[in-house]
């Protein structure tokens, strides 16, 4: 969704059949599979989103141009690590399906999120963290610092290695 509650730990993301028309309040990722679903459903991506997204009142306002296009995806990912993310993403879908009377909004209510769905997200985070080689903390600040370092490397900014300018003390 373009706008999501600030109370949610994860933005509810899912698949829809080809006959579904997306409104201007949804984003679509054509050709996305389980790997993309997993990456976008992870704490890593959600930490990035909470830092880079705009706001509509206090809710997060997701942007393709700012959040998605600038998200520093992991580099070369082995087939085994990719499969681990895909499998964990499918487990999230399975956990959601176990609650057929609940909407995505219901499932991602932080006060009512089912334990099996929360556990599936924990397993996904472990798999996604492994794709990055991330061994830092589980808090957003540590994740975002890691992602910004990756972003700088991908963008070729080399800010950490830039020569500092000498001050003119004259």
Question: PLM features: residue spans?
Answer:
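Polybasic, glycine- and aromatic-enriched phosphate-binding surface used to engage nucleic acids
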Residues: 1-87, 91, 154, 162-170
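Non-catalytic DNA-recognition/assembly elements of restriction-modification systems
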Residues: 68, 72-170
């Amino acid at each position: 969704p373009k706008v999501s509650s600030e109370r949610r730990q994860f933005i509810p993301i899912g698949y829809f059949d080809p006959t579904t028309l997306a409104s201007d309040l949804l984003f679509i990722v054509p050709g996305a599979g389980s790997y993309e679903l997993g990456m976008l459903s992870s704490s890593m991506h959600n930490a990035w989103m909470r830092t880079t997204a705009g706001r509509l009142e206090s809710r997060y306002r997701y942007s393709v141009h700012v959040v998605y296009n600038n998200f520093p995806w992991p580099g070369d990912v082995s087939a085994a690590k990719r499969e681990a993310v895909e499998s964990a993403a499918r487990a999230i879908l399975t956990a959601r399906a176990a609650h057929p009377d609940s909407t995505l909004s219901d499932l991602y209510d932080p006060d009512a999120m089912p334990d099996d769905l929360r556990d599936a997200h924990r397993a996904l985070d472990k798999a996604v963290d492994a794709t990055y080689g991330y061994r830092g903390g589980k808090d957003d600040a540590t994740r975002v610092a890691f992602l910004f370092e990756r972003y700088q490397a991908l963008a070729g900014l080399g800010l950490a290695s830039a020569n500092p300018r000498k001050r003119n003390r004259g």
